[in-house]
């Protein structure tokens, strides 16, 4: 599937680039239903132009040229004329300007004088004036006055007052901020207009009452003691115990994993990658699949492995689709052992298979779902890796753990087996043959993948959501890529693919 998407990207980028390069033609265009050839100059000559007057007065020199559904002013030598301005207007304008400047200067001077007067005033005098207006000094010749009797209960707002609230109430009862009242000595502090409501000591008592447990001095001391001294000791003990537990668990897991790996290595030491009996030296590396047997599910955790490597957890829809294609392994007959193994096992049977190599190629792009990040990485340059190493060999050999293009028999030419019927025609065969000759792919391209590639290019908006995302990505690439840069990047590959340089990819 990665090959299908790569080639779809390359084909559509080349088509858009060549269309953009051949867009600015200077030749006249042919009408769709007529043999008449016309250019822009011919059309201008056919449309009659006439001169219109702007006004009905014959002395007016302004004229308009009407034609081609446009109107523009004609250039005249006497279009701009100098109008004499009376002296009275000039004198009045100068007088208004001078008066405005004088008023602005006067306002600025007033502001400067005010700032200078405020600058000399000391701060202490201002504070003394404010304090003098707010309160009066106590009379030392008179005794202290008890202004409230039930203040502890009022401040605490509960049935029983705390010790610290009692102390605050004692301080609040002794009022020496003002002279003795002529009326009764006790007032109700709960009244909305009580004289004692806004006093400074009442506010202090209310601030002290905010702590609900302020009266319990022993509990408060114990809390401070734990938070300052014992808390760090407890944390150190917890971290040490947790560290020892984690280390012991890691050691136990490591010993268990090493023992399991050694047993698995001994059991798999003499086993081939795929049990293909009667393989000769000159025979293919992979035997053709048995059509009588159903595909084998070789791994059940491919979606989660791909999601972890692509840093996209949980797996998205496109990862499930890729995993569904990779998990159905019908390149060889079914193995005799268990059909479900782990794909990330260090010695698993899936490690050196072709589908694992395809998954690793998909893993190269870390932001496969992020179109903007994909574009910032200059993906057109990244596509040039398809053309690297154009040597004599079109593909890597099996020694490098890659597959070679296999010449299958005619009765099994479409591999892997598709899930639905594949329509084969001459066009598909030509595109597939030209594709294999033009590109140096890191994996073998099957005919089914070529059919999928053409389907993506033809479906466009009438396809699945994943194909729509691929088409939108291709449009972004086609808009932002310079058409002059495409021939340099893709060079002779598309010339081979097209067969003729004059033809365009539809």
Curated annotation (Swiss-Prot):
Keywords: Host nucleus, Secreted, Signal, Virulence. A motif (RxLR-dEER) lies at residues 50-71. Its main location: secreted. It is found in: Secreted; Host nucleus. One of its GO terms (cellular component) is host cell nucleus. Residues 1-19 form the signal peptide. Secreted effector that completely suppresses the host cell death induced by cell death-inducing proteins. The RxLR-dEER motif acts to carry the protein into the host cell cytoplasm through binding to cell surface phosphatidylinositol-3-phosphate. Belongs to the RxLR effector family. This is Secreted RxLR effector protein 134.
């Amino acid at each position: 599937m990665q090959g299908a998407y790569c080639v779809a990207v390359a084909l559509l980028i080349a088509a858009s680039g060549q269309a953009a390069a051949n867009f600015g033609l200077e030749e006249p265009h042919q009408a769709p239903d007529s043999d008449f050839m016309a250019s822009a100059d011919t059309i201008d000559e056919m449309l009659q132009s006439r001169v219109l007057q702007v006004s009905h007065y014959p002395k007016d020199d302004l004229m308009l040229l009407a034609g081609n559904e446009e109107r523009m002013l004609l250039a005249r030598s006497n279009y701009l004329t100098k109008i004499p301005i009376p002296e009275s207007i000039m004198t009045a304008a100068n007088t208004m300007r001078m008066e405005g400047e004088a008023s602005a200067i006067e306002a600025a001077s007033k502001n400067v004088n005010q700032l200078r007067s405020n600058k000399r005033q000391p701060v202490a005098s201002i504070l003394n004036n404010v304090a003098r207006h707010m309160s009066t000094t106590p009379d030392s010749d008179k005794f202290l006055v008890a202004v409230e009797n039930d203040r502890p209960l009022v401040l605490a707002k509960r049935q029983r007052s705390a010790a610290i609230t009692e102390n605050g109430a004692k301080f609040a009862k002794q009022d020496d901020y003002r002279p003795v009242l002529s009326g009764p000595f006790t007032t109700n502090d709960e009244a909305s207009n009580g004289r004692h409501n806004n006093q400074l000591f009442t506010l202090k008592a209310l601030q002290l009452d905010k702590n609900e447990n302020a009266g319990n001095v022993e509990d408060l001391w114990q809390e401070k003691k734990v938070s300052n001294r014992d808390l760090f000791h407890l944390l150190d003990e917890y971290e040490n115990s947790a560290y020892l537990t984690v280390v012991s668990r890691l050691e136990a897991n490591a010993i268990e994993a090493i023992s399991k790996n050694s047993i698995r290595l001994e059991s798999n030491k003499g086993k081939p990658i795929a049990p293909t009996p009667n393989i000769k030296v000159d025979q293919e590396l992979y035997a053709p699949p048995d059509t009588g047997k159903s595909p084998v599910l070789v791994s059940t955790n491919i979606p989660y492995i791909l999601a972890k490597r692509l840093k996209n957890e949980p797996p998205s829809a496109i990862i499930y689709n890729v995993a569904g294609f990779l998990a159905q392994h019908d390149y060889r007959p079914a193995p005799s052992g268990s059909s479900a193994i782990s794909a990330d096992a260090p010695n698993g049977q899936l490690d050196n298979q072709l589908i694992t190599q395809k998954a690793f190629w998909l893993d190269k792009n870390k932001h496969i779902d992020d179109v903007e990040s994909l574009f910032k990485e200059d993906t057109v340059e990244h596509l040039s890796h398809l053309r690297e190493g154009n040597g004599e060999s079109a593909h890597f050999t099996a020694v490098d753990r890659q597959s070679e293009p296999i010449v299958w028999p005619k009765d099994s030419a479409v591999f892997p087996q598709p899930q639905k019927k594949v329509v084969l025609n001459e066009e598909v065969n030509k595109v597939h043959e030209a594709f294999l000759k033009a590109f140096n792919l890191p994996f073998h391209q099957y005919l089914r993948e070529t059919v999928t590639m053409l389907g993506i290019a033809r479906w466009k908006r009438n396809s699945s959501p994943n194909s729509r995302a691929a088409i939108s990505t291709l449009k972004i690439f086609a808009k932002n890529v310079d058409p002059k840069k495409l021939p340099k990047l893709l060079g002779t590959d598309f010339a081979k693919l097209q067969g003729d340089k004059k033809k365009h990819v539809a």
